[in-house]
């Protein structure tokens, strides 16, 4: 027990050290941006000279928090340089790569490597062997989604939705985590990405409802079981309600993942707002706290998105027994 306790303490220390190093690696880019920003504000003459290409190459947007979270066609590795992504145009449509697209590809590649690695490890295991390392972690997460999310909220027949729920959970989780790596970008901080994920949940939900109840049952749900005279009110309300769920999923994930990064950049930017490094220890300390909180938020938001998706699917496929069988209770007659 003492060995395990010391081992866990050692792992926590190493993890904390990596987080601090990652945060400090972001500082050169912010310091470099702040230095250029200060030179630009040195005087009107210097500002005019910079505007006409007189040698300074500052960008006032460098200290703008929004500039650091929006999508773009380049990766800014200040003070080392900028990597521009290739421009692609097909049939008059601009399908050029962006930071968030690249980060989604990286997230997908990481997931494939992890899943294939864990799968190969399970193939080599005997019945009496317990999974170790990454396989053990993945088993815990998969069982958590299966038992506490899918089975709890969908009930009977939850197994067929497991591939979808596991996919969105791990994809959102990996996108959230790699967004904390210095010089990277958070794809889930893009409302187009979160909207696409929410649309997939919407399509799965409605298709499952039609499959469970048929077209007639699906349309009857829009009336809310009310008197025909009330349909003029109930149908629009229920129809709008169909779209409020994916809208809530979209905005919730987008806002939470964007807010944390803006807070970190803003705290570090206070160093240059006050134009003194005396404020640096306070800013870095608060930024480090938010950075640690963002790790928790990365897991929490992936869980909430998956939980709400399972809840919406469960509500859509619930039968006339009101889900009693799904929750292990005998239906009343």
Swiss-Prot record:
Q: What is this protein called?
A: ATP synthase subunit a
| Presence of the UniProt keyword Transport in the record | yes
Assembly, per entry:
F-type ATPases have 2 components, CF(1) - the catalytic core - and CF(0) - the membrane proton channel. CF(1) has five subunits: alpha(3), beta(3), gamma(1), delta(1), epsilon(1). CF(0) has four main subunits: a, b, b' and c.
The annotated topology with respect to the bilayer is: Multi-pass membrane protein
What gene name is listed for this protein? atpB
Tell me the organism. Answer: Chloroherpeton thalassium (strain ATCC 35110 / GB-78)
Name one cellular component (GO) term: proton-transporting ATP synthase complex
Name the family the entry cites.
Belongs to the ATPase A chain family.
Q: Where in the cell is it found?
A: Cell inner membrane
Signal peptide (from-to) = 1-32
Q: Give the highest taxon in the source lineage.
A: Bacteria
UniProt xrefs under PANTHER family: ATP SYNTHASE SUBUNIT A
Mark the transmembrane ranges: 100-120, 161-181, 185-205, 229-249, 254-274, 279-299, 300-320
Name any one GO molecular function: proton-transporting ATP synthase activity, rotational mechanism
Job description of the protein: Key component of the proton channel; it plays a direct role in the translocation of protons across the membrane.
Q: Per UniProt, which keywords does this protein have?
A: ATP synthesis, Cell inner membrane, Cell membrane, CF(0), Hydrogen ion transport, Ion transport, Membrane, Signal, Transmembrane, Transmembrane helix, Transport
Q: Which segments of the protein form a coiled coil according to its record? A: none
């Amino acid at each position: 027990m003492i060995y395990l306790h010391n081992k866990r303490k050692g792992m926590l220390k190493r993890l904390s050290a990596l987080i601090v190093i990652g945060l400090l690696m972001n500082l050169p880019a912010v310091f470099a941006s702040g230095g250029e920003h200060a030179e630009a504000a040195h005087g009107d003459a210097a500002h005019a000279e910079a505007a006409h290409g007189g040698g300074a190459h500052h960008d006032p947007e460098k200290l703008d928090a929004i500039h650091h979270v929006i999508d773009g066609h380049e990766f800014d590795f200040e003070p080392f340089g900028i990597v521009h992504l290739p421009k692609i145009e097909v049939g008059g449509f601009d399908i050029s790569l962006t930071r968030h697209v690249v980060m989604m590809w990286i997230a997908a590649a990481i997931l494939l490597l992890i899943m294939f690695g864990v799968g190969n490890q399970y193939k080599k295991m005997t019945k009496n062997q317990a999974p170790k390392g990454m396989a053990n972690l993945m088993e815990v997460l998969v069982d958590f989604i299966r038992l506490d999310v899918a089975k709890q909220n969908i009930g009977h027949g939850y197994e067929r939705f497991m591939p979808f729920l596991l996919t969105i959970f791990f994809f959102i989780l990996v996108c959230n985590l790699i967004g904390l790596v210095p010089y990277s970008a958070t794809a889930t901080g893009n409302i187009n990405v979160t909207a696409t994920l929410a649309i997939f949940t919407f399509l799965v939900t409605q298709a499952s409802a039609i499959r469970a109840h048929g077209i007639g049952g699906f349309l009857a749900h829009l009336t809310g079981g009310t008197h025909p005279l009330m349909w003029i009110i109930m149908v629009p309300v229920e129809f709008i309600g169909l779209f409020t769920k994916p809208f809530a999923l979209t905005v919730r994930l987008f806002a939470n993942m964007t807010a944390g990064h803006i807070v970190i950049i803003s705290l570090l930017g206070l160093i240059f707002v006050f134009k003194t490094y005396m404020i640096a220890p306070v800013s870095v300390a608060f930024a480090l706290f938010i950075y640690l909180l963002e790790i928790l938020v990365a897991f929490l938001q992936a869980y909430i998105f998956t939980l709400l998706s399972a809840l919406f699917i469960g509500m859509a496929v619930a039968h006339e027994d009101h889900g009693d069988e799904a929750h292990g209770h005998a239906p009343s007659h």
